[in-house]
């Protein structure tokens, strides 16, 4: 099927094919309200290298299920408060290198960059889910409860980090920005929706959006391949199709 299957005017008014669950807002309110001060504990390790303008740190904290999550933190050396960028990486990757991230300090910003659990960086994914782990994280945990879904955990990892950075001595809490590309854009949007202290959000080509539309257009390939794989192996007659997309709707960023 063509990727351009509706007129431009219709696209301009299009709001997505995903049906937002009736309890979507209540579900995510419960999730973030379950975060306690214990969840916001972290360990900050200063790196040996530095320069006159910047200080470099590694951040470790526990995700919602106890998995150890890793992030890089760079801030200007001056002893005052600065705007801070919360940067998220694209799918299968990891946080950018120290040199790359140092560019934020050059314009007077701090930056924190998280490694998504179980992908290309240092964050831990402790697993323990029911169902397939093949062909991508979109379907990871789909056969279990909502709390088992991989991206529910990643979204909460990102939210916890957004709360942690508010505690940093050099954070100007009135100037917190979330940013990302692809998967990172999805996380940037989700944390901006869940944490009202984030006052700016910048996205590039977001992933994890409008799963039903992706399926209807036969674009369930590459990062979305898990959807096709799941139906071929576990529901070839599509008996559970409605249920599957209803569950995916809880992590579909079109609903945030």
Which residues fall in each region the model found?
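A short loop-to-beta-strand scaffold at the N-terminal edge of the catalytic core in hydrolase folds
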Residues: 55-60, 64-76
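Short beta-strand element of the alpha/beta-hydrolase
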Residues: 71, 75, 81-91
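Serine-hydrolase catalytic core
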Residues: 242-256
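Gly/Ser-rich "nucleophile elbow"/oxyanion-hole loop immediately N-terminal to the catalytic nucleophile
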Residues: 137-182
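Aromatic pocket-lining residues of Rossmann-like dinucleotide-binding sites
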Residues: 104, 165, 191-192
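Cap/lid segment of the alpha/beta-hydrolase catalytic domain
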Residues: 96, 102-105, 109-156
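N-terminal targeting or regulatory segments adjacent to alpha/beta-hydrolase or S9 domains
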Residues: 1-54
């Amino acid at each position: 099927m063509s990727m351009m299957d509706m007129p431009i005017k219709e696209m301009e008014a299009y709001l997505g094919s995903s049906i937002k669950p009736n309890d979507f807002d209540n579900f995510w309110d419960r999730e973030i309200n379950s975060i306690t001060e214990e969840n916001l504990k972290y360990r900050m390790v200063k790196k040996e290298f530095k320069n006159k303008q910047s200080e470099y740190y590694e951040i470790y904290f526990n995700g919602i299920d106890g998995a150890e999550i890793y992030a890089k933190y760079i801030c200007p050396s001056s002893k005052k408060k600065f705007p801070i960028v919360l940067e998220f990486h694209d799918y299968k990757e990891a946080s950018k290198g120290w040199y790359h991230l140092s560019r934020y300090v050059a314009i007077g910003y701090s930056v924190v960059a998280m490694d998504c659990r179980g992908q290309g960086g240092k964050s831990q994914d402790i697993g323990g889910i029911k169902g397939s782990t093949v062909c991508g994280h979109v379907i990871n945990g789909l056969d279990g409860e909502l709390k088992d879904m991989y991206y529910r955990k990643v979204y909460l990892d990102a939210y916890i980090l957004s709360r942690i950075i508010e505690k940093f001595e050099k954070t100007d809490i009135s100037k917190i920005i979330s940013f990302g590309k692809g998967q990172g854009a999805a996380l940037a949007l989700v944390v901006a929706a869940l944490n009202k202290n984030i006052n700016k959000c910048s996205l590039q080509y977001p992933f994890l959006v409008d799963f039903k539309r992706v399926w209807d257009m036969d674009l369930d390939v590459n990062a979305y391949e898990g959807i096709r794989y799941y139906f071929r192996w576990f529901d070839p007659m599509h008996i559970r199709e409605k249920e599957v997309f209803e569950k995916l709707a809880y992590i579909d960023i079109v609903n945030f």
